[in-house]
């Protein structure tokens, strides 16, 4: 919670991993057998926040978690964990290879897709600051405040916040 005023010029909206693999039919989460209605629940609020951010000139940043097609940036323990739950990263699924850059499941869902001029960062890990230029983008744009939204709150959003 923040009790002060928000200066749009110094605030960025960071939309974390709203990807088909996490909240779309045939994606990674759907393939694991989870109810994607739960992962999609935050989309309407995020769409409204995006509309507000765009209208006020706030910097909008989107992230996508994914790995190179040859999986050379996929740590062994991450691959092992995904295989244990039956949806190994890189394996074929209804939305293409799971969490692989360039595949349909890696794309951001249409409801909150980036528009031209918005920052789009690709990351191989959970946090948006790991192996990306997010810090540089924030500093270059004079950003002092962040509004975070995304999927999965307990993993990627929380890791970015920390």
Which residue stretches match the model-derived regions?
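Active-site acidic carboxylates
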Residues: 1-115
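Positions that flank functional sites
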Residues: 68, 128, 153
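Internal catalytic-core helix/loop-beta-alpha segment
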Residues: 97-146
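Active-site-adjacent alpha-helix immediately C-terminal to a catalytic or transition-state-stabilizing loop
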Residues: 140, 161-162
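Short beta-strand immediately N-terminal to the catalytic nucleophile in serine-hydrolase-like folds
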Residues: 149
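Short glycine/serine/threonine-rich phosphate/pyrophosphate-binding segments
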Residues: 153-160
